[in-house]
Amino acid sequence: SDSTISYKAQNLLEQAKKIQQLSNSTNTMLIWIAGISLLVGGIGVMNIMLVSVTERTSEIGLKKAIGAKKKAILMQFLTEAVVLTSLGGLLGVISGILLAFVISSLNQIPVAISVEASIVAVVFSMVIGIVFGLLPSYKAANLDPIDALRRE
């Protein structure tokens, strides 16, 4: 029988470069997925808030008729949007941490939880609430009280 042994020389520097390229590609893909998810989530929040404004038109009209300022109504709806997205962000961080620990326990892979990243995630969700809550809040603040009360 022919028993030949073959050897393959590998340059560790080239392997490290390939691993770095793969890591960079993966990070880029994850950033795109996260960005698209945030955009879709933000649009969802905006739609929910627009529906809320529509359903509460008479309430807004009544508040304006008894003297509520535009700024107060704008801040009310903006606060609701920020609370909604903050709770979503907090729930997402908690779910992510729990999932990381479950996967870690199954694969015996250590988990490192970044408090800074968790805080950034919740703050970013608040920013999404502000950005995507502006249009519905502005719409609510600028409703004409007479038209709003007439719709009831």
What are these regions (language model features)?
Residues 1-30:
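Mechanotransmission and gating elements of multispan inner-membrane complexes involved in transport
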Residues 20, 58, 150:
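A short local structural element in Rossmann-fold oxidoreductases
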Residues 137-152:
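Short cytosolic juxtamembrane segments of multi-pass membrane proteins
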Residues 28-104, 108, 112-132, 136:
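Transmembrane alpha-helical interface segments in multi-pass membrane proteins
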Residues 17, 46, 147:
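Glycine-centered loop/turn positions within well-structured domains
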